[in-house]
A protein has these predicted regions:
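Glycine-rich, phosphate-binding/catalytic loops in enzymes
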Residues: 13-15, 99-103, 129
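Short, solvent-exposed loop/turn segments at secondary-structure junctions
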Residues: 2-5, 88-91, 117-118, 127
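Flexible "cap/lid" loop of the alpha/beta hydrolase fold
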Residues: 1-23
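Generic structural signal for small/hydrophobic residues in well-ordered secondary structure
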Residues: 51, 75, 84-87, 110, ...
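Catalytic active-site module of serine/aspartate enzymes centered on a nucleophile-bearing elbow/loop
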Residues: 107-138
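Short glycine-/acidic-enriched loop or helix-start segments at secondary-structure transitions
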Residues: 6-9, 94-96, 122
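Conserved loop-alpha-helix segment in the C-terminal half of the alpha/beta-hydrolase fold
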Residues: 83-116
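Conserved alpha/beta-hydrolase catalytic His-Asp/Glu region
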Residues: 8, 22-80
Length: 138
């Protein structure tokens, strides 16, 4: 989000105050699969619990900023090296992932992790750590 590369609108579902806990959990499951994870099998009850807690704390209910290119605009102000790790199957960048290093030209490095969605660190932790650990040791 914030790269100006957001393509297709994702099939996200909304909540309503009259939903039961079971219905809310079904919406979270659907939304996690639609946006955050590449594999249905990655969604379990513990992850739904985490997502419920995340959504309850969310202060930006609308995602207008996600559809802007604000991050590309502020990269000139970065005062340290910024490295990017994306999941190759990130639903937010399907068809545009290869453009990320071009629009974020100030990235010190760009890594694409195969077989992972937006939450690459959750879905493919070993590959994520293989990409990030050397950066932290540098």
């Amino acid at each position: 989000p914030g790269l100006g590369l957001f393509g297709e609108v994702l099939p996200m579902r909304g909540m309503s105050p009259d939903m039961t806990d079971t219905q809310q959990r079904a919406v979270h499951r659907h939304n996690l699969k639609a946006m955050m994870l590449a594999h249905d099998s990655s969604v379990d009850e513990a992850l739904i619990d985490l997502q419920q807690a995340n959504v309850a704390r969310d202060r930006m209910r609308r995602r207008r900023i996600a559809r802007t290119d604000v991050l590309t605009q502020v990269q000139a102000n970065w005062t340290c090296a910024v490295h990017g790790v994306w999941g190759e199957l990130d639903a937010l960048y399907l068809g545009t992932l290869q453009q990320v290093p071009q629009v974020l030209s100030k990235l010190a490095s760009f890594t694409s992790v195969p077989d992972a969605g937006h939450w690459v660190m959750f879905e493919r932790p070993d590959a994520f750590h293989a990409a990030v650990d050397p950066l932290l040791k540098a």
